[in-house]
Structure formats: C-alpha cells, structure tokens
Amino acid sequence: EKVEKIYYTEQTKNDFRAVSEKVQKKFLKDYKADTPEYAILFFTKGFNGEKIEVRNEEEIIFVDGVTTDKTTGLAKNMRIKVTLDTEIYDKATKKKIYVKSDKVGKHKFIYIMKDTDGEQPYKITYSDKLRPAK
C-alpha cells in the first residue's frame, strides 16, 4: 500500500488583522459563498506564476498560473465546496496538497502559502477571518 507523502502543514488561526464583519459578509455574498457548503480558498505568499490546478471529485475548479501580488500578499482566490475534499496540484513542484472537508468544518476562509525551502513547502491556514487586501 502506497502511503502518500504529506507536503503541507495545517493550522487554524483567527488572531490577525481582519476586515469588518460587514465587509466580510458582503465578500462572501459576492462570491456566492454565504451558505455553509462553501468557503473561499486563497493562494497567498510564494507563488510566481506556476500553473496550479484545483479540483474536487465533481469538477475542475481552476487551472491557471498563480502569481502573488507583492503589495497585498495575495495571489488568487476562489469558491470551493467544503462538503468535498479539494485537491490542489502545483505543476512546478509536481506536488499535491489537500483541503479536507472534515478539516474545513465551519471555517469560511482557507489560505495557502508556499515556501519552497522545506520538506513541506505549503502551509494551509483555516480561518473565520477575511484578511484585508491592503
């Protein structure tokens, strides 16, 4: 039985600067993610144009280059279904990471950071808070 190597670490974090509740609600509504089965997935630091594929068992959600905006620290965001596991494949590193539905739980925001130095270059942060874009 092949054991898949884990290329990421996970944490839950809510103690950072966030937007107001009102702004957060509007953001979720604009992305049609204001119901329990959806969350927003963010790619943040460390992405330099590499092609990323995001999928679940129902659909391919996103396939494109992802580049971090140096001023905001954000790269790309999208709505995902939290009732399904989400697979993220980085074509540059040929590594797959997973946002597991049981880990997401009630969290509305999932941030993925990349730092190619270590054995686990990706950090997944589950949060109830939306970080400001500025």
Regions found by a protein language model. Name each.
Residues 1-134:
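Terminal leader/tail segments of proteins
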